């Protein structure tokens, strides 16, 4: 994997920086693990925009990734190849199990074709293997961590992501996330050893607005250039300041304001990610 700065043959390529991984498969993805993916464009079932700045973009097939990895315990597996996935920042690996079944998983850092993998409590503590947290040594770097047993990985799934197992106490373990938050999870929750691969993803430079549109991301208009009917920062004669602290279009403070409202799981957070 390497960062490649393109030659300035056009304004769009002048500042472009690409992440090149020669180990990625160059052919078609594994067809049985593909599903149709329909454009939502940030709309809900009523057609109302629930997520702004989404729409357009290239068509993608969804790659069915196994985030649970709990029904192949003790079965030897081998990484067949690494692949690009347009639906996420991390790369994925096509894994062949000894019983003949193939599945996609999130590729960990250092994973290569031909590497042996195993799931379950008997698996060795080696990057790419998936185990219950009760069988993972304290201090181990992990990724693809479950929050609820059997629900599938929800934490540390993006490129370069990881968490650290800090402690085990009774039925719960403490996991420190990249944000600094320390969270309690049940020891029957599963996690994968190591960090997520494609860690240089955050260093890429897209280079031009059109490439962002290919990814289905639409422009973000500043509130200060809108009319008062559209945004609290809008209005004024000529170019004017917002006249107040930064807020969202709905008046919620935009800088440092806590919006977490799920009190039911507050007891599972040992240390918040906020400094104050």
Swiss-Prot record:
UniProt keywords (A-Z) are: Ribonucleoprotein, Ribosomal protein, RNA-binding, rRNA-binding
| GO aspect biological process, one term | cytoplasmic translation
InterPro entries noted in UniProt: NA-bd_OB-fold (IPR012340), Rib_uL2_dom2 (IPR014722), Ribosomal_uL2 (IPR002171), Ribosomal_uL2_bac/org-type (IPR005880), Ribosomal_uL2_C (IPR022669), Ribosomal_uL2_CS (IPR022671), Ribosomal_uL2_dom3 (IPR014726), Ribosomal_uL2_RNA-bd_dom (IPR022666)
Pfam families hit by this protein = Ribosomal_L2, Ribosomal_L2_C
Where does the record place the region Disordered? Answer: 38-59, 225-276
Which GO cellular component does the record give, naming just one?
large ribosomal subunit
List the cysteine pairs that form cystine. Answer: none
Q: Locations of Polar residues compositional bias?
A: 39-49
Per UniProt, the ranges with Basic residues bias are 50-59
Single GO term (MF): structural constituent of ribosome
Q: Which family does it belong to?
A: Belongs to the universal ribosomal protein uL2 family.
Q: How is the quaternary structure described?
A: Part of the 50S ribosomal subunit. Forms a bridge to the 30S subunit in the 70S ribosome.
The record ties this protein, via NCBIfam families, to:
rplB_bact (TIGR01171)
- Please give the function described in this protein's UniProt entry: One of the primary rRNA binding proteins. Required for association of the 30S and 50S subunits to form the 70S ribosome, for tRNA binding and peptide bond formation. It has been suggested to have peptidyltransferase activity; this is somewhat controversial. Makes several contacts with the 16S rRNA in the 70S ribosome.
Identify this protein by name: Large ribosomal subunit protein uL2
- What organism does this protein naturally occur in? Cupriavidus metallidurans (strain ATCC 43123 / DSM 2839 / NBRC 102507 / CH34) (Ralstonia metallidurans)
């Amino acid at each position: 994997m390497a960062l490649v700065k393109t030659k300035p043959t056009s304004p769009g390529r002048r500042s472009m920086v690409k992440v090149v991984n020669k180990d990625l498969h160059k052919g078609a993805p594994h067809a049985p693990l593909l599903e149709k993916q329909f454009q939502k464009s940030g709309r809900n079932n009523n057609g109302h925009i629930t997520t702004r700045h989404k729409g357009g973009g290239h068509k993608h097939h969804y790659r069915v990734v196994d985030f649970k990895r709990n029904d192949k315990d003790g079965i030897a597996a081998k990484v067949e190849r690494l692949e690009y996935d347009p639906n996420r920042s991390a790369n994925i690996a096509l894994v062949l199990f000894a019983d003949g079944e193939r599945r996609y998983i999130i590729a960990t850092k250092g994973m290569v074709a031909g590497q042996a993998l195993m799931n379950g409590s008997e698996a060795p503590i080696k990057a790419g293997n998936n185990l219950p947290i009760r069988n993972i040594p304290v201090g181990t770097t992990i990724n693809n961590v479950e929050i609820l047993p059997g629900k599938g990985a929800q934490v540390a799934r993006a490129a370069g992501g990881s968490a650290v197992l800090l402690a085990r106490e009774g039925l719960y373990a403490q996991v420190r996330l990249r944000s600094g938050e320390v969270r309690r999870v049940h020891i029957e929750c599963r996690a994968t050893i190591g960090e997520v691969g494609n860690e240089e993803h955050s260093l890429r430079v897209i280079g031009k607005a059109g490439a962002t549109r290919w990814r289905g991301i639409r422009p973000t208009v500043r509130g200060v250039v809108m009319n008062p009917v559209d945004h609290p920062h809008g209005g004024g004669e000529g170019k004017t300041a917002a006249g107040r602290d930064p807020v969202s279009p709905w008046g919620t403070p935009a800088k440092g304001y806590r919006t977490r409202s799920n009190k039911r799981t507050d007891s599972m957070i040992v240390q918040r990610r906020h400094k104050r």
